[in-house]
C-alpha cells in the first residue's frame, strides 16, 4: 500500500474511533464533556480548511480508483478476447487481476472514508442538538400537574363562557380562537408529560 493510501486508512481508523465514541450509550454527564473535547479542535478555521483539502484529495483518489478499475476491466476483456498464446495469456491475466484487486481495494477504502466522514459530521450535529435540548429542558422551570389542570379548567370555563356569549351575541370568531387556545394548552400539557417521562428514562 502506498503512502497516501496508508494515510487514508489512518483517517478511516480515526473516523471509526470517533463514531464509536459518539454511538456508545454514555451517560449525559460524561457524554457532554467528551463530545466537546472531540469537537474542540474542529472549531479552528485552520483545521477546517485542512480537513476540506484532505477530503478533496481523498475524493480525487476515489475518482482515480474508479477510472482505474474501469480501464483494467477493459484491458481484461481485451486480453480475454485475444487467445493466441495460452501461457502468455494466463500470466498476463493473473497480473491484470492482481492490479484490479488493488484498484478495487483502494476504491472501497477511499469511498468508505468519504462516506464515514459525512456520517460522523451528521452524528456530531445530532449529539450537540440533543445536548442543547437537554440543557434547555433542565433550565426551564418545572410545571406542576396541578397548575396544568388548573389552566385547563380555566380554559374550559372560558370556552364555555365564550359559547354562551356566542349564542347571545353570535361572536363565532372569539369562540374559535378560544377553542384553538384550549387545544394548544392540551398539546403543551401532553408534551410536558412526555418530556418528563423521557427525562426519567434518561436519568
Curated annotation (Swiss-Prot):
Keywords: Endoplasmic reticulum, ER-Golgi transport, Membrane, Protein transport, Transmembrane, Transmembrane helix, Transport
Localization of this protein: Endoplasmic reticulum membrane
InterPro entries referenced in this protein's UniProt entry, alphabetically: BAP29/BAP31, BAP29/BAP31_N
GO cellular component, one term: endoplasmic reticulum
This protein's name: Endoplasmic reticulum transmembrane protein 3
Ranges of the Cytoplasmic topological domain: 28-45, 132-203
Protein family according to the UniProt entry: Belongs to the BCAP29/BCAP31 family.
Sequence segments annotated as region (Disordered): 142-171
Membrane topology field: Multi-pass membrane protein
Function: May play a role in anterograde transport of membrane proteins from the endoplasmic reticulum to the Golgi. May be involved in invertase secretion.
Principal cellular location given in the protein's record: endoplasmic reticulum
Keyword presence, Protein transport: yes
GO terms classed as biological process: endoplasmic reticulum to Golgi vesicle-mediated transport; intracellular protein transport; protein localization to endoplasmic reticulum exit site
Lumenal side: 1-6, 67-110
Misc note: Present with 2840 molecules/cell in log phase SD medium.
Keyword Protein transport: yes
Pfam families: Bap31 (PF05529)
Segments crossing the lipid bilayer: 7-27, 46-66, 111-131
Coiled-coil ranges per UniProt: none
